[in-house]
UniProtKB/Swiss-Prot annotation:
Keywords: Cytoplasm, Endonuclease, Hydrolase, Nuclease, tRNA processing. GO terms for cellular component: cytoplasm; ribonuclease P complex. It catalyses: Endonucleolytic cleavage of RNA, removing 5'-extranucleotides from tRNA precursor. Part of ribonuclease P, a protein complex that generates mature tRNA molecules by cleaving their 5'-ends. This is Ribonuclease P protein component 3. Its EC number is 3.1.26.5. It is found in: Cytoplasm.
Length: 236
């Protein structure tokens, strides 16, 4: 299982500190998904070797302009293992763009309806069940976050849309174990399997994208005959 993190300067902890904590929490890897204006320098291989967890390069695109978002997605698609879009004004754009992997916290500054859920399912865009405000907010904001998660869960279930789960940690102190997240999920109506599946989905996305970029893949739907007579099918 993996967790998507915001490292310094987007957050308050270094990539190395996140990796160390993730290892102690039982994770197999972390996705560094800093916003585009807060990128960080790190040696993924060195950190992985030191702490025994994979460090995945990600990006969370944040803008209110769809044209700019489209350009940024195209720019980062070949440079990052996971491309996320910051939810809100870009919810519709994100679910209609197959190059987007994850629509991050779609309920925080926006909304999701049946049309968007269906589009996400058709285009393979993962909704994020973001438990950050459930864990760290209180009062009305926490209630609103819980209501948003429940509504999103109903739509995801109805349309069988893909999803990921995250505590959205900006500090290593906010990185929760899968067991802790599952327990929190149960208090707001999620079963444990849904939470662990959502944490595992980060790794599934990474594997899929790396496979798509492999030398054997020319374009979706193309079958390539290898020298040994076998075929590689690039269709997803």
């Amino acid at each position: 299982m993996y967790e998507g993190v915001h490292a310094h300067p987007d957050g308050n902890a270094t990539v190395a500190r996140f990796a160390e904590t993730a290892a102690s929490r039982g994770y197999d890897g972390i996705v560094v998904r800093n916003h585009g204006d807060a990128q960080t320098d790190y040696d993924a291989d060195a950190v992985a070797a030191e702490y025994g967890v994979e460090v995945v390069s990600g990006i969370e695109i944040r803008t209110d302009d769809t044209a700019q978002a489209s350009g940024l997605v195209g720019n980062y698609r070949s440079k990052r293992d996971i491309v996320c879009v910051h939810g809100g004004e870009l919810n519709r754009f994100a679910v209609e763009e197959p190059k987007v992997d994850v629509l991050a916290h779609p309920m925080r500054d926006g909304d999701v309806n049946h049309v968007l859920a269906k589009a996400a399912a058709e285009n393979g865009v993962h909704f994020e069940f973001n438990f950050g405000r459930v864990l760290r907010a209180d009062g009305g904001k926490r209630v609103q976050a819980i209501q948003g998660l429940r509504k999103l869960r109903e739509l995801v279930d109805q349309y069988d849309a893909p999803y990921v789960v995250s505590a959205d940690p900006e500090s290593h102190l906010e990185l929760r174990s899968s067991r802790d997240l599952a327990a929190v999920g149960e208090t707001v109506g999620f079963d444990r399997e849904a939470i662990t599946d959502g944490l595992a989905a980060w790794a599934d996305i990474v594997e899929r994208n790396r496979r798509r970029r492999s030398a054997a893949v020319v374009e979706p739907g193309v079958r390539i005959e290898r020298a040994d007579g076998e075929t590689d099918d690039s269709r997803e």
